[in-house]
Amino acid sequence: MVPLWWYIVLGVVLFVIGAAGVLIRRNILVVLMSLELLLNSVNINFIAFGHYYDDFRGQIFAIFVIAITAAEVAVALGILVALVRNKSTLKVDDVTMMKG
Protein backbone atom coordinates (compact mmCIF):
# COMPACT_ATOMS: atom_id res chain seq x y z
CA MET A 1 0.00 0.00 0.00
CA VAL A 2 1.23 3.46 -0.89
CA PRO A 3 1.80 5.68 2.17
CA LEU A 4 -0.35 8.76 2.64
CA TRP A 5 2.56 11.17 2.52
CA TRP A 6 3.34 10.17 -1.09
CA TYR A 7 -0.09 11.40 -2.12
CA ILE A 8 0.38 14.58 -0.10
CA VAL A 9 3.75 15.24 -1.73
CA LEU A 10 2.26 14.56 -5.18
CA GLY A 11 -0.59 16.96 -4.46
CA VAL A 12 1.76 19.66 -3.20
CA VAL A 13 4.09 19.30 -6.19
CA LEU A 14 1.19 19.51 -8.64
CA PHE A 15 -0.23 22.49 -6.74
CA VAL A 16 3.10 24.34 -6.90
CA ILE A 17 3.45 23.61 -10.63
CA GLY A 18 -0.10 24.82 -11.25
CA ALA A 19 0.37 27.96 -9.15
CA ALA A 20 3.61 28.75 -10.97
CA GLY A 21 1.82 28.30 -14.29
CA VAL A 22 -0.97 30.66 -13.26
CA LEU A 23 1.44 33.30 -11.98
CA ILE A 24 4.16 33.10 -14.65
CA ARG A 25 2.53 32.20 -17.96
CA ARG A 26 0.89 34.84 -20.16
CA ASN A 27 -1.16 32.59 -22.47
CA ILE A 28 -4.79 32.40 -21.32
CA LEU A 29 -5.15 28.77 -22.39
CA VAL A 30 -2.04 27.75 -20.44
CA VAL A 31 -3.29 29.67 -17.41
CA LEU A 32 -6.59 27.77 -17.67
CA MET A 33 -4.75 24.44 -17.84
CA SER A 34 -2.63 25.43 -14.85
CA LEU A 35 -5.78 26.25 -12.92
CA GLU A 36 -7.11 22.79 -13.75
CA LEU A 37 -3.87 21.31 -12.44
CA LEU A 38 -4.37 23.23 -9.19
CA LEU A 39 -7.87 21.87 -8.75
CA ASN A 40 -6.85 18.31 -9.60
CA SER A 41 -4.06 18.44 -7.03
CA VAL A 42 -6.67 19.34 -4.44
CA ASN A 43 -8.75 16.38 -5.63
CA ILE A 44 -5.80 14.04 -5.10
CA ASN A 45 -5.48 15.21 -1.51
CA PHE A 46 -9.24 14.94 -0.90
CA ILE A 47 -9.30 11.36 -2.13
CA ALA A 48 -6.08 10.39 -0.32
CA PHE A 49 -7.31 11.70 3.03
CA GLY A 50 -10.73 10.17 2.47
CA HIS A 51 -9.18 6.79 1.78
CA TYR A 52 -6.76 7.06 4.69
CA TYR A 53 -9.52 7.85 7.19
CA ASP A 54 -12.07 5.45 5.60
CA ASP A 55 -14.46 8.31 4.93
CA PHE A 56 -16.38 8.95 1.73
CA ARG A 57 -16.51 12.70 2.23
CA GLY A 58 -13.18 13.13 0.46
CA GLN A 59 -14.53 11.42 -2.63
CA ILE A 60 -17.75 13.42 -2.45
CA PHE A 61 -15.82 16.68 -2.26
CA ALA A 62 -13.68 15.56 -5.20
CA ILE A 63 -16.80 14.88 -7.27
CA PHE A 64 -18.13 18.34 -6.39
CA VAL A 65 -14.83 19.92 -7.40
CA ILE A 66 -14.88 18.03 -10.71
CA ALA A 67 -18.44 19.22 -11.41
CA ILE A 68 -17.58 22.83 -10.58
CA THR A 69 -14.42 22.57 -12.66
CA ALA A 70 -16.40 21.31 -15.66
CA ALA A 71 -18.73 24.31 -15.42
CA GLU A 72 -15.77 26.65 -15.02
CA VAL A 73 -14.06 25.21 -18.09
CA ALA A 74 -17.22 25.57 -20.18
CA VAL A 75 -17.59 29.24 -19.25
CA ALA A 76 -13.87 29.96 -19.62
CA LEU A 77 -13.62 28.35 -23.05
CA GLY A 78 -16.66 30.32 -24.21
CA ILE A 79 -15.02 33.54 -23.06
CA LEU A 80 -11.76 32.42 -24.67
CA VAL A 81 -13.43 31.80 -28.06
CA ALA A 82 -15.13 35.22 -27.92
CA LEU A 83 -11.82 36.81 -26.98
CA VAL A 84 -9.99 35.22 -29.90
CA ARG A 85 -12.71 36.34 -32.30
CA ASN A 86 -12.63 39.94 -31.07
CA LYS A 87 -8.98 40.52 -30.18
CA SER A 88 -7.19 37.75 -32.17
CA THR A 89 -4.85 37.04 -29.28
CA LEU A 90 -4.47 34.67 -26.35
CA LYS A 91 -2.03 36.80 -24.35
CA VAL A 92 -3.18 38.06 -20.97
CA ASP A 93 -1.32 41.35 -21.39
CA ASP A 94 -3.07 42.23 -24.66
CA VAL A 95 -6.52 41.94 -23.15
CA THR A 96 -6.97 44.96 -20.92
CA MET A 97 -10.63 45.85 -21.29
CA MET A 98 -13.75 43.84 -22.02
CA LYS A 99 -16.99 45.48 -23.05
CA GLY A 100 -20.37 43.96 -22.26
Curated annotation (Swiss-Prot):
The chain crosses the membrane at residues 4-24, 28-48, 60-80. GO terms for molecular function: NADH:ubiquinone reductase (non-electrogenic) activity; quinone binding. It is found in: Cell inner membrane. Pfam families: Oxidored_q2 (PF00420). Its main location: membrane. GO terms for biological process: ATP synthesis coupled electron transport. The keyword Ribonucleoprotein does not apply. NDH-1 is composed of 14 different subunits. Subunits NuoA, H, J, K, L, M, N constitute the membrane sector of the complex. This is NADH-quinone oxidoreductase subunit K 2. It comes from Rhizobium etli (strain ATCC 51251 / DSM 11541 / JCM 21823 / NBRC 15573 / CFN 42). The lineage of its organism: Bacteria, Pseudomonadati, Pseudomonadota, Alphaproteobacteria, Hyphomicrobiales.
